[in-house]
From Swiss-Prot:
Domain of life: Bacteria
HAMAP family reported in the protein's UniProt record: G6P_isomerase
Protein name: Glucose-6-phosphate isomerase
The species this protein was found in: Nostoc punctiforme (strain ATCC 29133 / PCC 73102)
GO biological process: gluconeogenesis; glucose 6-phosphate metabolic process; glycolytic process
UniProt-listed Pfam families: PGI (PF00342)
Amino acid sequence: MDARALWQRYQNWLYFHEGLGLYLDISRMRFDDAFVESLQPKFDKAFADMAELEKGAIANPDENRMVGHYWLRNPDLAPTPELTQEIVQTLEQIEAFAEKVQTGAIHPPRASRFTDIISIGIGGSALGPQFVAEALAPDFPPLKIHFIDNNDPAGIDRVLNHLRNSLASTLVLVISKSGGTPEPRNGMIEVKKAYAGHNLEFAQYAVAITSVDSNLDKLAKDEGWLARFPMYDWVGGRTSEMSAVGLVPAALQGIDVRAMLDGAKEMDDATRVPDVKNNPAALLALSWYFAGNGKGEKDMVVLPYKDSLFLFSRYLQQLVMESLGKEKDLDGNVVHQGIAVYGNKGSTDQHAYVQQLREGVANFFATFVEVLEDRQGPSTEIDPGVTSGDYLSGFLQGTRQALYENHRDSITVTIPQVNPRTVGALIALYERAVGLYASLVNVNAYHQPGVEAGKKAAASILDLQTRVVAVLQKEKTPISLDELAKKAGASDQIEAIYKILRHIHANQRGVVLQGDLHKPGSLTVSAS
């Protein structure tokens, strides 16, 4: 296709949202009109499915749940007046709490103000808040946020050591839907111990964001924590940024959460239009389906050309992969669906993996995210008439062109600036695109059985560790791994036992491994 034909295709397929100033360009995806026409019946069903979802249908049949994250930014859509009122009241409570913390009306016992936040959560309870904090927090926020989003002891220590001199003015958010997920529970226990070590009463610094009557909710109530905010069973972790999960940390940092909700609502209105060409989420779903042949055959590479959006790819990684990566479809057929997502930021990526994108395996499609406003205020000219922002824009356009010339397809999303409205709109755009695409390929986008399987497997390893240590404590002399496995009733789990013992030994926790480390089967083990 020559340059003039490409320019016409660009105009034909360009979507523009005037209220948000958002552009979506899918002209560099090489589908034709016949392909679009062939998908129309699937889209008709997808639009109908989405309409029923928003009305309160059981859109997550595997867990028998409604899916209501769209109600969070438009409470009037909720299927009952009680839900509408609860959503409105929760938002008002979040804003009131944030204001009291920022003004010092709520303050720690030993300081006039809270200065920092530790946010403890994992998965959707971390990725959304991290993305929004990086994108939107002011340079000097009223409270500076720090995340504990893993079970890595050294990572926890790093956060706590950084806050050693300001722990007495640090608020703690504990975010866990079930209240029993191991990672946030363990993080809370570690942080609680650190506060006790500084003679600080944890309850006077703690906030729970969890399901009503969960174990965490009961603990927070019994201990008299500063506040408790609800999580709903009809909001999944990966779509929870517009709930208390995302709004509490955002509001505390001084981010305009109403504007973020307004941007999401405005995008929701646009993506509710039952017309593929005039619905930006449908255009994304169409492009994804074309790129991967409806089977996820190509990866999605996300390249935001803005430092503040560099966590967008990690956020989308969970949203897309946890939603679409399913073994079975809604009819029980084995389909192994999904789209792999990765990325970092431009133009850094041009000096990293874009070499392979341009000349290597063509197993991907790119998504460029462009921000029109370079910075607040004027820019210095690097060369006559050229700023650093011009260079960044040129790098994006050049990479897009270079990929297309070598038969690599791409999508470009353009926003006027990074602000709460546009970030809310981006989140809503991709939430809807995921839902529509899931309908196109007939999978449940709102459950995660693979995650649950991993949790169960991890629990079985910890149970095995308890049994193995109990056997060792009774033994008087070193024994082989084979013998230990037999006595622990786990003869078929020798490798797992070896790895458990290697870890305990490395941390000097009462286990001694002896023998040739090159030959694990020759080792003997004893309690020290």
